[in-house]
Amino acid sequence: MEIGTEISRKIRSAIKGKLQELGAYVDEELPDYIMVMVANKKSQDQMTEDLSLFLGNNTIRFTVWLHGVLDKLRSVTTEPSSLKSPDASIFDSHVPSNKSSFSRGDERRHEAAVPPLAVSSSRPEKRDSRVSTSSQEQKSTNVRHSYDDGASTRLMSTVKPLREPAPSEDVIDIKPEPDDLIDEDLNFVQENPLSQKKPTVTLTYGSSRPSIEIYRPPASRNADTGTHLNRLQLHPQQSSAHAAKQLDVQSSQVSEAGRLCEPPVLSSVEDTYSPFFRNNLDKMSIEDENFRKRKLPVVSSVVKVKRFSHDGEEEEEDEDYGTRIGSLSSSVSVPAKPERRPSLPPSKQANKNLILKAISEAQESVTKTTNYSAVPQKQTLPVAPRTRTSQEELLAEMVQGQNRAPRISPPVKEEEAKGDNTGKSQGTQQRQLLSRLQIDPVMVETMEMSQDYYDMESMVHADTRSFILKKPKLSEEIVVTPNQDSGMKTADALRVLSGHLMQTRDLVQPDKPASPKFIVTLDGVPSPPGYMSDQEEEMCFEGMKPVNQTSASNKGLRGLLHPQQLHLLSRQLEDPDGSFSNAEMTDLSVAQKPEKLLERCKYWPACKNGDECVYHHPISPCKAFPNCKFAEKCLFVHPNCKYDTKCTKADCPFTHMSRRASILTPKPVSSPAPSSNGQLCRYFPACKKMECPFYHPKHCRFNTQCTRPDCTFYHPTITVPPRHALKWIRPQSSE
């Protein structure tokens, strides 16, 4: 950027800071408006008149301050550069006395065309030539400075000749005010005059042997080691026909030299301002300036643009300076592309820490491996292969020994040995297949014996029955004869593990209508009385119980045996020596509890059985309360009734801790019975006697508005006159 633009930006930032100090800063429009007035050289009175609407009582104070700053910029001193104090930032230039009125207010221009102001220094040996490019714009060196926090740190920029100036020469001394808020970088830029499209202010310095020095006090040099300090020194080259510029930026040196080799002209400074481009100016205040190096000997070179990042650190270059000198006939400059500036103000922008935190959390969620708990597999039993020896055949074989043992007739006893042999020969197959057996309930009902498996003789004499379940009786066992074979053990194991009473029924056998009965006795305490009828109780006391032929259950072995029971049963069958531990059987009997009925316990919450109660005790609260339609039969918890046992509401949805007394239904209001003769009360509808024995018809709820022609209720015949008939009108006098 040009030095004029930098000065204008500093003036604008100072104006903005002053407005904030006065409490009059609202947005960027007011500083831009003030800069336009400064560019148009408004007087103090005109500024006071124009700004009184915005600043109010602070208008005069602000305009006095602003014009004081502008007067300081116009002040001319004759002090030589060698006598200047190190704590002041001074920019010296040799100009004629008739054109020494250099104002920072002239830096900003409105979009309207304003003739450029050229301030030139004239010396006897001056030549009117300028450093320019042949085809494209060239920019001079951007010098970046960082100021210390110390109040005594200043930057002194001096343009001085190598010889003492003449007494007649005028010097422009630019000293910043304490409240100018000049704490940003100072950039020097030389731009191509041929490419100008805006009103500019050009400052031209002429000298035979000039040099530009940037001086910094030793204290600030020691304090700021990471700051890039630059000194631009200009001196003529041995060949006066061509020019060259050189800049080296080093972080460890106090000053570095860049060379400009054309003696007639030192530099050309241009500044433009337009309020319509303030977005670009704001962008300049955020971004660091583009940094370029260029050496112009007889030939030109391609120069890489150097730029600064936001944190002030300089990006490293890819190649050394010495390799940049080429033998090209033209100059190619690559301008730095400014970074995109967000349109929102900083106060409305998203916090960078929140964005970084969200990015880190997203990366953690992607990289983190979630350990999912293994889904427990269901206990499944392998199903026996579907062969001609089907499941019903295996089940019949399993109960064959049990059915043969309790024989009554002698022919059955003769066949008993044969059945035992058959059961023993097939015991291994039973043990192998029973652990994998899953019998469908329908197969139990429709079980038939296969003729391929049994011969006709065994079919005639063998008692083939299927297992059925009548009612859950936990303490009943089948008492069988002492001689038991493997088939009997199988049936007994099934009966003990299931905990239910197993009974059998005959298949349809036309040649044998009378089937032998299977005698069952009770071992231990009889079943609860509620589970059997009176006849069954009498049979239990006698020690015998008939077989219920008609109670056919739809439940098969799958309903009787759970997977755990089938596993234990298979282990017991595979253990013919009887070494199967009784502890496992005990654990099974303990684990096997009757399933609770899906009916709410009427004694809850005062039930004494606790968890052993077969009825349901609510645990979780009811979500439909108080609109629950189940009332006290709901399987979920309802709040307690505050009346408890005294509650007389039959359908009270609340919970009652103790049982309520039998709720007496409220007596219906006794309506007077109509008389037997049905005579209408003569005073109706004006009768006021509550126990009038005569008939009083019931009034229709719609009264005279009823539209049903067949309505059986009473409708008064005397109607109320219309509204207009009820209006009183004063009678007219007969005068």
Curated annotation (Swiss-Prot):
It comes from Mus musculus. Keywords: Acetylation, Differentiation, Isopeptide bond, Metal-binding, Nucleus, Phosphoprotein, Repeat, RNA-binding, Spermatogenesis, Ubl conjugation, Zinc, Zinc-finger. InterPro entries: Nab2/ZC3H14, Znf_CCCH. This is Zinc finger CCCH domain-containing protein 14. A zinc finger (C3H1-type) spans 595-620, 621-640, 641-656, 681-698, 700-718. The modification N6-acetyllysine is found at residue 357. Residues 412-421 have a biased composition (Basic and acidic residues). GO terms for cellular component: axon cytoplasm; dendrite cytoplasm; nuclear speck; nucleolus; nucleus; ribonucleoprotein complex. Belongs to the ZC3H14 family. It is found in: Nucleus speckle. GO terms for biological process: mRNA stabilization; spermatogenesis; spliceosome-depend formation of circular RNA. The keyword Hydrolase does not apply.
